[in-house]
């Protein structure tokens, strides 16, 4: 069972791309930074003025990583399986994990940033990560709604049974 890109539908492609965006934003983009007069002072002292998600969200990072892995597993399973059973199950996991991650990130990015609110602010990575988690949840839902057998995996001809007699036998 090799991976066939033709088995992927739009929701799985979107989930895979959003998972990669979330993963990259976790490590490469600043999620939180100092605001106000502290940022220039910290920069002059050689202190980093921003942190990525991996270093600033000690518990949430595991949920985010699990969401990324589930979305990538959905892409892999959809591309390698002829039957929709496993991809359908993973669509549910991706939908639920993406939704839970989005809710947690809404809280951590928009409502309660780590650290004092008058000192720490959310940066671009936090908003990109939040958007990516919302997209993953939506793609998981759309993938679940579109479940079925791909046209190339469908049976070519459905066998039918022909009866020559139209009479019904009566018991004697």
Predicted regions and their residues:
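Compact integral membrane and secretory-pathway proteins
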Residues: 1-172
């Amino acid at each position: 069972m090799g991976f066939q890109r033709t088995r992927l539908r739009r929701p799985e492609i979107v989930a895979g791309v959003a998972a990669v965006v979330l993963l990259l934003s976790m490590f490469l983009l600043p999620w939180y930074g100092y605001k106000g007069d502290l940022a220039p002072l910290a920069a002059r002292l050689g202190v980093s003025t921003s942190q990525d998600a991996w270093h600033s969200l000690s518990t949430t990072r595991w949920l985010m990583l699990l969401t990324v892995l589930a979305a990538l597993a959905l892409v892999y399973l959809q591309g390698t399986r002829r039957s929709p059973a496993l991809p359908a199950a993973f669509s549910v996991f991706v939908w639920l994990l993406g939704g839970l991650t989005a809710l947690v990130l809404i809280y951590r990015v928009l409502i309660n940033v780590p650290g004092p609110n008058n000192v720490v602010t959310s940066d671009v990575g936090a908003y990109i990560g939040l958007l990516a988690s919302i997209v993953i949840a939506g793609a998981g839902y759309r993938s679940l709604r579109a479940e079925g057998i791909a046209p190339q995996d469908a049976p070519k001809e459905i066998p039918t049974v022909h009866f020559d007699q139209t009479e019904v036998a009566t018991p004697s």
